[in-house]
A protein has these predicted regions:
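N-terminal membrane topogenesis motif
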Residues: 1-27, 80-91, 126, 222-243, ...
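Signature of the first transmembrane helix
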Residues: 8-73, 101-105, 136, 171, ...
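Hydrophobic alpha-helical transmembrane segments
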Residues: 19, 161-213, 273, 386-391, ...
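Interfacial/gating helices of multi-pass transporter permease domains
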Residues: 33-55, 82-85, 125, 188-193, ...
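Transmembrane helical elements of multi-pass membrane transporters/channels
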Residues: 11-28, 166, 191-210, 225-296, ...
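Helix-loop junctions and terminal segments of transmembrane helices
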Residues: 61-77, 152, 214-215, 272, ...
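Interhelical loop/hinge segments that connect adjacent transmembrane helices in multipass membrane
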Residues: 1-9, 188, 204-250, 293, ...
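Membrane-proximal transmembrane or re-entrant/amphipathic helices at the cytosolic face
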Residues: 2, 432-437, 456-514
């Protein structure tokens, strides 16, 4: 069973990484074109207004995690009723979408009119972007139960095709923006409408495809009785608390930056966050590919298999992260200027470095997050995480009030994440008798040794006299090869290297390369 599970996870991972590579490459081009077409100020407005929407769309994140978890658990049960669980989640999402719409059209409009710091003459554009973003947020919430079906059935190929198609469409629309509406007074409004088009396409596709593939599951059948929703809503409540703290930490900090600094600093934070998201997506995709297997193992009562899988996922995610982190760190200044061009907002480089450090600490939760959700007893995990994340906002406010630079709040993120991981292990041991030493040794020890060796390498690398674009690109490639060699020789065990070398596709490739 473990072998079949590994094969399915590997297949899902390959599909997800193909999607990720395409979307990141296209996204990098799109980001640069948007900066050229709109300018740093309008990009900052779009980011700040989007933060206001994201801050109140925390319900979406909470309901998404709940839906995927309960559907996977239902799939793992021998007598699971997926149609009943789908209808419970669908009803909950529709109510959540209505609640978000009400919040956005009241408190959100108040924020835009009274608190948002925008250049003169741009208030109307900000309100237009806000209304478009409101519609997009509500559609995304209503779409979650249908998209979750593709996740629990491990139809990652379909999800990948939809995401790739959406990314390519966005690129084509941005090219049209550059050609026909570059530096146009209405450019920001046109861009907002263009970005909403992909959401409408996804919404229609997932609804129609779900009714084609799983008509019995999506068949509308009202589930009566409060008990049917109590467990889902209780789980959602704690996820809601956690999601609100995460959004407050990221998007709320964006609003804090807007209050103390200019919109160009918002743009720098936006691009640093974009880089962090790209790196985290590279890692979290493997985590996502393993989620159905891990959760269904716990649902079937096989806790040992679930914990073993969580430890393995954590180590592999850390190794994948290191393959990106050190090459990026070695040539970050050059790569950001290559990506964004001469119009790169000030402070982007320093914010990006701290964002990478935030990601480095965050990735240590890979596998653990899925395992905790699968266990189901999430109350204290969500409470402690949310408390630490929310404390970052007042800490950032105090730092900004005393004149500290914009990146100071990212330092708060790093400290909060370190404390969060320590408390998570304490809770896991207390609530589930989880063997923390076994997990730490198996998940963190090998990556930690690679980190030490790569830090020595980076210290020596900085002494090299690199001049010209090709020398910097060669240095980036060299750092990647050195890190990859350490991941292969130290990060993977002897049995893992042996299995990879014996894999039929690897053997076939080696024969053809001779």
């Amino acid at each position: 069973m473990a072998g079949r599970s590994d094969i399915r996870i590997a297949k899902n991972t390959v599909i997800i990484y193909v999607r990720m590579i395409v979307t990141i490459l296209v996204g990098l081009v799109t980001s640069r074109l948007v900066l050229q077409a709109l300018g740093a100020s309008d990009v900052g407005i779009y980011s700040a207004v989007g933060s206001a929407v994201a801050l109140v769309s925390i319900i979406s994140g909470a309901l998404t995690g709940t839906t995927v978890r309960f559907m996977n658990i239902e799939m793992g049960k021998p007598d699971g009723d997926l149609n009943r669980m789908f209808n419970v989640c669908h009803t909950t999402h529709l109510c959540g979408a209505a609640l978000i719409f009400l919040i956005l059209e009241t408190l959100g409009i108040w924020y835009i009119h009274t608190q948002l710091n925008v250049p003169p003459g741009k208030a109307g554009d900000a309100m237009f972007v806000f209304q478009v973003s409101t519609v997009v947020a509500c559609l995304n919430i209503a779409n979650v139960p249908f998209q979750s079906l593709f996740n629990v059935h491990e139809k990652f190929g379909t999800i990948a095709l939809v995401d790739i198609a959406n990314t390519v469409v966005k690129l084509l629309l941005v090219l049209a923006l550059c050609l026909f509406w570059r530096e146009s007074p209405a450019g920001l409004r046109i861009y907002a409408v263009m970005m909403s088009a992909a959401t409408w396409v996804s919404f229609l596709f997932y609804h129609l495809a779900s009714r084609k593939y799983w008509p019995d599951t999506v068949r509308w059948h009202p589930v009566k009785g409060g008990s049917a929703y109590r467990e889902v809503l209780s789980f959602s409540g704690y996820n809601l608390l956690f999601s609100s703290s995460m959004i407050a930490r990221t998007q709320g900090s964006n609003m804090l930056i807007n209050a103390f600094f200019s919109t160009t600093v918002n743009a720098a934070y936006f691009y640093a966050s974009t880089l962090q998201n790209y790196v985290m997506n590279f890692v979290s995709n493997f985590d996502a590919a393993s989620a159905p297997q891990l959760t269904q193992s716990i649902g079937a009562g096989d806790n040992g298999q679930g914990e073993l899988l969580a430890r393995r996922v954590c180590r592999v995610c850390l190794l994948l992260f290191l393959l990106l982190f050190f090459p990026l760190w070695s040539e970050l200044d050059f790569l950001l200027r290559l990506w964004l061009g001469a119009g790169i907002p000030p402070d982007t480089v320093v914010m990006s470095r701290w964002s990478l450090l935030v990601a480095a600490v965050s990735v240590t939760s890979a596998g653990l997050f899925q395992l905790i959700n699968a266990y189901g007893r999430i109350k204290w995990f969500k409470v402690e995480s949310s408390t630490l994340f929310l404390l970052c906002l007042p800490a950032g406010y105090l730092l900004y009030r005393d004149g500290f630079p914009a990146y100071s709040i990212l330092i708060c993120f790093v400290v909060a994440d370190i404390l969060n991981r320590i408390i998570q292990f304490i809770l896991l041991r207390a609530l589930f008798r989880f063997d923390v030493g076994w997990f730490v040794k198996g998940a963190y020890l090998r990556p930690a040794l690679i980190v030490l060796l790569m830090c020595v390498y980076i210290a020596a690398y900085r002494r090299l006299p690199l001049e010209g674009a090709w020398m910097h690109l060669a240095g980036f490639a060299l750092t990647f090869l050195v890190c990859a060699a350490l991941v292969w020789g130290i990060g993977l065990s002897r049995s893992e290297r042996s299995r990879l070398l014996r894999h039929p596709r690897v053997v076939s490739f080696l024969k053809r390369s001779r």
